[in-house]
From Swiss-Prot:
Signal peptide: none annotated. It comes from Mus musculus (Mouse). This is Heme oxygenase 1. The gene is Hmox1. The transmembrane domain is necessary for its oligomerization. It is an enzyme of class 1 (oxidoreductase).
Length: 289
């Protein structure tokens, strides 16, 4: 890897990360899915799949944050009460999948790839953990409330916020002020130009992992509508042993209310619209950072 020169990127880490991900911001601003997202058309089935993936991702991320909470390379960014999402996602899993959600939620290959990278970073390259925290938390914080309202309306969800706890940060009064604090803390992290370069590259990797996940889910849901075979569903339910209990997959709980969709929308179109929403959870939020 080519060593960056000291003056080849902004001095502040927050500015360096923003600069490094500028191309993704431009893509997000001009992408066609942004237009679809604004229509608020979201597939319930696809939304459930992504929420399950987010549960696995945040479980891994926050396990590694806890591992490194006293490590100087991350400690200034340790805000568990304000930012951590695992507990909120557990509430959402119970809403979407029922009381036995731990036994049945899917963990796709792309999700496993994402989880593996998070554990690898936390255990062997903790100085890169900031890139994943920055990409996820500030993005979610920036776009969370807007996305929550769109999802509530599109899927006729309760106004109380059930099923969407992930998008709510009850311990942050002002997202704008908190993001300013977070960036200031980021800029106190001591790192060489080479390490800073590696952190910015890892932020790009985080974006690629998200894109890989959404592309995979697009293929999976499209194929599932064509041929919903038992073997396919069994493969979908394979989960990392470190994340859930070692139990046999259970059948999906019955009795969950189903939200009807327009008969004029094909399954493929419904999924494209869902993908628009899912990508927006990264793109809209990150663009607002």
């Amino acid at each position: 890897m080519e060593r960056p020169q000291p003056d080849s990127m902004p001095q502040d880490l927050s500015e360096a990360l923003k600069e490094a991900t500028k191309e993704v911001h431009i893509q997000a601003e001009n992408a066609e899915f942004m237009k679809n997202f604004q229509k608020g058309q979201v597939s319930r089935e696809g939304f459930k799949l992504v929420m399950a993936s987010l549960y696995h991702i945040y479980t891994a991320l926050e396990e590694e944050i806890e591992r490194n909470k006293q490590n100087p390379v991350y400690a200034p960014l340790y805000f568990p009460e304000e930012l951590h999402r695992r507990a909120a996602l557990e509430q959402d899993m119970a809403f979407w999948y029922g009381p036995h959600w731990q036994e049945i939620i899917p963990c796709t290959p792309a999700t496993q790839h994402y989880v593996k990278r998070l554990h690898e970073v936390g255990r062997t390259h903790p100085e890169l953990l900031v890139a994943h925290a920055y990409t996820r938390y500030l993005g979610d914080l920036s776009g969370g409330q807007v996305l929550k309202k769109i999802a509530q309306k599109a899927m006729a969800l309760p106004s109380s916020g059930e099923g969407l706890a992930f998008f709510t940060f009850p311990n942050i009064d002002s997202p704008t002020k908190f993001k300013q604090l977070y960036r200031a803390r980021m800029n106190t992290l001591e790192m060489t130009p080479e390490v800073k370069h590696r952190v910015t590259e890892e932020a790009k990797t985080a974006f690629l992992l998200n894109i890989e996940l959404f592309e995979e889910l697009q293929v999976m849901l499209t194929e599932e509508h064509k041929d919903q075979s038992p073997s396919q569903m069994a493969s979908l339910r394979q989960r990392p042993a470190s994340l859930v209990q070692d139990t046999a997959p259970a059948e999906t709980p019955r009795g969950k209310p189903q939200i009807s969709t327009s008969s004029s929308q094909t399954p493929l179109l419904q999924w494209v619209l869902t993908l628009s929403f899912l990508l927006a959870t990264v793109a809209v939020g990150i663009y607002a950072m």
